Design a protein with these regions (language model features):
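Intrinsically disordered, low-complexity polar regions and short flexible loop motifs
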Residues: 218-224
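Residues within well-ordered alpha-helical secondary structure of globular protein domains
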Residues: 71, 95, 197, 224-227
Length: 230
């Protein structure tokens, strides 16, 4: 039975699932999309990355996929057996996916120089026939999404101040433990935060890289998780 992950690791949600598969040592193949139509073909439910073929099912949404992986291969678990800690892990994962993610999106798509770099990065592995469509459609579409979400309406200095506060809060939550909530084993929360920090810490978003580099604790956290899932 082939397990196939559909998506590009430039997406923090694909990276989250990729690291989960590696953590559980589940062999898999990765198929990258060759254009926007592949997204709908690979994931007809939502048309987004990632999707996963697992045990004869086509799964979607990174949270739902990792939940299914925990059932497919329970060890190592992605949630603590302690219900209060597991609840905190689920909440942090959801916050990383639904809130922290948008800081990276604004930095990529609402700053012209970063948008140019982002499009170049996205297009380099796409067929030449698709690139003009991406260059034309993506900036306008994604920037409108960030404004509708709210963060895209903030002045850049305010956005970066808020991002800094969130990163400082993550350091407090991490504490002295190797992973969040003083656990020795990465959880679904760690995978989600790792994916979003990597999304911020990118050559296309120097502002995000500078923000993360202020916190050595977060860089060391990423190094630990990377070593366990490389």
């Amino acid at each position: 039975m082939a397990i196939i992950l559909y998506g590009n690791r430039l997406s923090p949600f694909v990276e989250k699932v990729h690291r989960g598969l590696m953590l559980k040592q589940i062999p898999f193949q990765q198929h990258e999309p060759h254009g926007p139509f592949d997204l709908r073909r690979n994931n007809p439910t939502t048309g987004k990355m990632p999707a996963l073929d697992l045990d004869g099912q086509r799964l979607f949404d990174s949270t739902l996929i990792l939940r299914a992986l925990d059932e497919f291969k329970p060890e190592p678990p992605l949630l603590s057996p302690d219900p209060p800690i597991a609840a905190q892990q689920r909440l942090l994962e959801d916050w990383a996916d639904e809130s922290l993610y948008w800081y990276g999106m604004v930095l990529r798509w609402n700053i012209p120089a970063n948008t140019t770099r982002t499009i170049k990065l996205i297009c380099k592995d796409l067929p030449p026939v698709v690139r003009p469509l991406i260059k034309l459609m993506a900036p306008r579409f994604v920037a409108s999404q960030t404004r509708a979400q709210g963060l895209g309406r903030l002045p850049l200095n305010v956005l970066l101040q808020e991002l800094d506060r969130h990163l400082a809060n993550l350091v407090q939550l991490l504490g002295d433990g190797p992973f969040f909530f003083s656990t020795s084993q990465p959880s679904i929360a760690d995978l989600a935060v790792f994916g979003q920090l990597g999304f911020l810490y990118s050559p296309v978003t120097p502002e995000g890289t500078a923000a993360v580099e202020k916190y050595s604790e977060l860089l060391e956290f990423c190094q630990r998780l990377d070593a366990m899932t490389d």
